Amino acid sequence: MRDPAFPGAAMAYHPFHAPRAADFPMSAFLAAAQPSFFPALTLPPAALGKPLSDASLAGAAEAGLHLSALGHHHQAAHLRSLKSLEPEEEVEDDPKVNLEAKELWDQFHKIGTEMVITKSGRRMFPPFKVRVSGLDKKAKYILLMDIVAADDCRYKFHNSRWMVAGKADPEMPKRMYIHPDSPATGEQWMAKPVAFHKLKLTNNISDKHGFTILNSMHKYQPRFHIVRANDILKLPYSTFRTYVFPETDFIAVTAYQNDKITQLKIDNNPFAKGFRDTGNGRREKRKQLSLPSLRMYEEQCKADRDGAESDASSCDPAPGRDSLHSPLSAEPSPLRLHRNNREEKFGADSDQELDRREIRSARSHSPVGHRSPPSSPRLEDRGKDKSTPEKKSDSPESRKDGSDSLFSSIRSLEKDKAESRRKEDSKSDPECGSLSKETFAPLMVQTDSPPHLSASHLQSLALSGLHGQQFFNPLNAGQPLFIHPGQFTMGPGAFSAMGMGHLLASMTGAGALDNGSLSSVQGATGAANPFPFHFSQHMLASQGIPMPAFGGLFPYPYTYMAAAAAAASAMPATSAATTMPRNPFLSSTRPRLRFNPYQIPVGIPPSTNLLTTGLPGSLNPGSESSKPGSSRESSPIPDTPVPKRSHSNSLSPKASMKDSINELQNIQRLVSGLESQREISPGRETPK
């Protein structure tokens, strides 16, 4: 609580003041502080001590005329003509003023309060707010404040503290800030705290808005004034009660110098968006979007590094950890060569061998079509898949750069393993149905958990940059997710900044994948084998290639990473989807989806007509052979369309066998042409 620093005289107004310069000329009250009040009225400092004699001079004063020409002979005149400017009858009051938010002001004062000033004006924080008591309830008061220089020094911030740097610059014009509610009764002022939060500080000396003009790097002291008057015009003739709070002094700066002050303002000012990470600006929103994905990426990398294999035992993967990972490394050599040397005994590069396997798998499947419950046969297959060594398909780069000896060795390895695959296929579930083939190669993402897609699954697939793409539309329940290549243009610029087309080849091997496993493409390399090619994520991590889970936003700055993951994405896998390893998931023909300069092996999945993918139903259990005429690479033998299969579940094994033989012949013709023209530039045809 403060008593008046300058207690007024007993008489509120006396006409015979000494002709001295006033602390604040009339222009400080009217012209500068409140532009709406008599902007042309400028009174000389000594004019307030000269009483006016008659009504004509009083009218001149009210009209805003300059009064410096008034002679000394008017001093003896009576004051009845200015009776309207005299104060009302004397009232008894004893104003007391308390500073609001004093604790916060003390915190700032202890460090050294700084207030930013700008050309356009900046508000103070903490705002100057006081609570007034002891006023006369009926009398009217004008409340105002001003900011004056605390000393005649200029300061600088050096070695984390403020020190004197020289003499002060010439003082800026003084301006009073009159509270917008003035004049008001004492009862109104005492009802609530009086806030001067709209006061703005500026360093623009030619400011026209009535802001308080200050010099940067100078110390200032705010002052609060109470004037008992019922009209703004009475201010020059009224007694000022002035209150000073030393804890509110500050140094004016154009930018905060002390980091502690900056942090205090961030912690306490709800409008300090410029410093805060969380805000409504685009920059802050971008940070908010990237933070969760970065945290998820770090957690998943750590989890996959520590126990990627332990996740393999989960039959129902969490929606945030999908069983598909996209290869993120552009260098083919460490992954592809290791793949060829380590487990290509299971991966076939021979198209003819693949054709034979397709026929065998087609013959081995039962004609009965139904969805088997998630029971022991599936778990057996899962166990077999886990017991086998990690498998990966050969990449387009290794096929492109490899020599004929590599092909021959792979073919011999494939011949050794063909019989075991055929035996495994004969034991497989009767549920893997043959679905009618299209003339293009649709990308299929099988699901492997309860056969319904909820909104949470779709949210977990929301890729950064791909959420609005047309092939990420909501799916109907109970069906595999089909991404048809005809739905997006597969040109070299199909995905922005792409050129990593071979990453699209990362497809799931549906039912036998674990949370921590990365499934690679089976296109042209083992389509009919029952063991899906996958390798553990921790192996990639050991080579320095982090592999985040598919769920959530990809933290990588490359859009082609997200694009590859989108095209090759797998949802949490349905228990009825063990059919894919036994089906010719990716056909035996040469790579289909292609980007220059990479070859992309993507095959034809066993699917119904794409028009029926949204309808829940059983898989069609017929022949497992895939259509050969869907190669996007121009070949010497034209594509021979095969009649589409019926969608009914009553397809006979004979018809399936006949179609399989026809397709085998077409595949053989196509493969012979591709073998002779392996070096033809890819990607010249587009899907129809």
From Swiss-Prot:
GO molecular function, one term: DNA-binding transcription factor activity, RNA polymerase II-specific
Assigned keywords, A-Z: Coiled coil, DNA-binding, Nucleus, Transcription, Transcription regulation
Main location: nucleus
Any one of the GO BP annotations: cell fate specification
SMART domains reported in the protein's UniProt record: TBOX
DNA-binding region, residues: 104-277
Coiled-coil annotated spans: 655-679
Function: Transcription factor which acts as a transcriptional repressor. May also function as a transcriptional activator. Binds to the palindromic T site 5'-TTCACACCTAGGTGTGAA-3' DNA sequence, or a half-site, which are present in the regulatory region of several genes.
Binding partners and assembly: Binds DNA as a monomer.
PANTHER family linked: T-BOX PROTEIN-RELATED (PTHR11267), T-BOX TRANSCRIPTION FACTOR TBX2 (PTHR11267:SF82)
Domain notes: Repression domain 1 (RD1) is involved in transcriptional repression.
Protein's name in the database: T-box transcription factor TBX2-A
Lineage: Eukaryota, Metazoa, Chordata, Craniata, Vertebrata
